[in-house]
């Protein structure tokens, strides 16, 4: 994880 996880979580929440 890391910074990538931050974006993935935000996108997943929107999806």
Curated annotation (Swiss-Prot):
This is Glucose-6-phosphate 1-dehydrogenase, cytoplasmic isoform. NADP(+) binds at residue 9. One of its GO terms (biological process) is pentose-phosphate shunt. It is an enzyme of class 1 (oxidoreductase). One of its GO terms (cellular component) is cytoplasm. D-glucose 6-phosphate binds at residue 11. Transmembrane segments: none annotated. Keywords: Carbohydrate metabolism, Cytoplasm, Glucose metabolism, NADP, Oxidoreductase.
